Amino acid sequence: MQKEKILVIDDEASIRRILETRLSIIGYDVISAADGEEALSIFKREHPNLVVLDLMMPKLDGYGVCQELRKESDVPIIMLTALSDVSDRITGLELGADDYIVKPFSPKELEARIRSVLRRVDKASSNNNLPNSGIINIGFLKIDVNKHQVYKNNERVRLTGMEFSLLELLISKAGQPFSRATILQEVWGYTAERQVDTRVVDVHISRLRAKLEDDPSNPDLILTARGTGYLFQRLNDSIV
């Protein structure tokens, strides 16, 4: 069985060495880059399964790397940030990152986040509330659950793995609101003990709306349940 490949991008050599060693021990194939330009070159050559991305780097920072990766790939991205300003982390998420960890961090915590993200992205849908055939038509959307593909007005919409998992959760119980805490647990695998900014959910909802709604500022599909969280509006849908 081929090992999953992880690209670690960080300008601190000590962090690269620690992560290369730890992640290799638990079974990953690890490659690394010291700056953003080198990272993009390695990415195109190696096609990793997941990227661990530091935000503050020379030549091309993490924001620029994230933007470039999202132009061509839906690869899972976990940000590493020493920035205390929440707005900086939110910017990274808005550019397409799937998750973040604040420095200094425990390598075990990062290992857990990597396993959780890869498990969520790689696994086939196992939600019993979704049809076995895997095709759901909702208004102008066609959702292929098994292939993790979404079409809007018959045109393919590219979603990251986490975006699709979030959509999959919402449509599994259309019309029922999900709290942010529930979404964090079901999609990201966070337990109640881990303190995390719930705006991770808000940013991913905004990204989904931007891709799926005709008017993201006035959504018809993914609605805000005031005081609760979010829900997928029940429409005249069909299952194939």
From Swiss-Prot:
Phosphoprotein found in the keyword field: yes
UniProt-listed GO biological process terms: regulation of DNA-templated transcription
Keywords in alphabetical order: Chloroplast, DNA-binding, Phosphoprotein, Plastid, Transcription, Transcription regulation, Two-component regulatory system
Response regulatory domain ranges (all copies): 5-118
Segment forming the signal sequence: none
Function, as annotated: Probable promoter-specific protein mediating the interaction between DNA and RNA polymerase.
Name of the gene: ycf27
Pfam families assigned to the protein according to its UniProt record, in alphabetical order: Response_reg, Trans_reg_C
Phylogenetic placement of the source organism: Eukaryota, Rhodophyta, Bangiophyceae, Porphyridiales, Porphyridiaceae
UniProt subcellular location: Plastid, Chloroplast
Name used for this protein in its record: Probable transcriptional regulator ycf27
InterPro entries with a match to the protein in the record: CheY-like_superfamily, OmpR/PhoB-type_DNA-bd, Sig_transdc_resp-reg_receiver, WalR-like, WH-like_DNA-bd_sf
Keyword Plastid: yes
Assigned GO CC terms: chloroplast; cytosol; protein-DNA complex
Molecular function GO labels: phosphorelay response regulator activity; transcription cis-regulatory region binding
SMART domains listed in its UniProt record: REC, Trans_reg_C
DNA-binding interval(s): 74-92, 133-234
CDD domains assigned to the protein according to its UniProt record, in alphabetical order: REC_OmpR, trans_reg_C
Residues with 4-aspartylphosphate modification: D54
Intrachain S-S bonds: none
